[in-house]
Amino acid sequence: EKFKSEIYSGEELEQLFKAIQGDPSEFGVIMAAFYGLRRSEVVGLKWDAIDFENKKISIQHTVVTAKVNGTLTEIARDKTKTKSSCRTLPLIPACEQMLNKMKKEQEQNRKVCGKSYCTDYLDYIYVDPMGKRIRPDFLSQHFPDFLVAHQMKRIRFHDLRHSCASLLYANGVSLKEIQ
């Protein structure tokens, strides 16, 4: 049976945003729903991609999971899936606040954890409290469990990207601009 993609309405997204607060997947969900980012783009976001002064966010790095010699490994790339995926978007206030909060939390965690804090991913935004970069598969594995636990309509993490596109289109944004 072929999988049927589902999307969230604006109202369902509002419910999701309330429920997801404080969850480890919150940043990924917000970025996928607000900006239509792929999980590889969310995990690949680096601090130098955020221009707080000019209120812009550049999507230019990805982190993907691939099999190398029979072992699953993460591969960081300084490129996106397609040329048109490389884009600059406006930094909306809600995301700017979240990013500022995350930056402060990371600095605090680094002080508290001292030498135990992983310094391999200091340039990445989406890291855990010990400084390790969040894995792309975490989002697609954790998200469905979160929805079930909160009795919300089941969609795939990638469907947040489609929900974003549908809402943009419904609000008068052209298909070319969404693309």
What are these regions (language model features)?
Residues 11-15, 45-108, 114-115:
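Conserved tyrosine-mediated DNA breakage-rejoining catalytic core shared by Y-recombinases
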Residues 14-25, 35, 89, 105-115, ...:
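Short, basic (Lys/Arg/His-rich) helix/loop patches that form interaction surfaces
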Residues 30, 97, 141, 145:
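Surface-exposed charge patches
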